[in-house]
Amino acid sequence: MAATFCSAPSAASAERRRAFLIPAPTIPATISPGGHADGYADYRGAEPVLRREFANTVDFIRKYRASGRLLDVGCAYGFFLQEARPYFDVAGIEIAEEAATFCRKQSLRVLTGMADEYNLAQLGMMDVITLLDVLEHLPSPHETLALCTRYLSPGGVILITTGDFASHSARVAGARWRLMTPPQHLWYFTLESVERMSHALGLRVEWYDHPWKIVPISLVAFQIRRMLGMRTAGTSTTSGVGLPVNLFDAMRIVLRKSA
């Protein structure tokens, strides 16, 4: 494994530059479709807001690859794939059967399961692979990234979004950090740990930042309530309302494979 591990959220700051593993290396049975919102109950109700944000993500990706074959790992209900479809030949992999079935009803090519050798072989080589808020959920992120790299065409790109364990927000909040949510999140990454994994696989980091995102107000409320130890609500009338948010604790990383 390219990254090293800490043993507790209170580890020293030097350790925060490395990947941190929660000792629960299994996929929770209660994981929400796509795993994108830590059990957030109204993912489908937030479709208008999410698709607006995903449209921005597509525009960003096209700076690095304007067209070609695109795979979204952990595609949930396919909202990102819908936005990418005008520019790419899209496919997805989704662990939740209900969400994957929904995608297929929208004429999206989505396989149910993990991004394993079997599913990736069925889909074939890709020019773009996205793991949007997914890597932290996986039992073996290094192995998944290695498989994705194998099925990435020369010169292709991988887009990763995940929490930044070295961020100021993570340091200040500690165990109450909004993204410190075991068992949904099994791994916590820093830029250094992602760079180590990527370099070992022959990938180079082409871009890194902490972008602003348009987030459903209901998700903001959900995370605040959870951080305060309050009972989280289900669906909300504010799911369709978006709010620009940036706590500078979520990374966006573009990796490129050598041509």
Where are these regions (language model features)?
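Conserved N-terminal segment of class I S-adenosyl-L-methionine
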Residues: 1-132, 141-147, 151, 206-213, ...
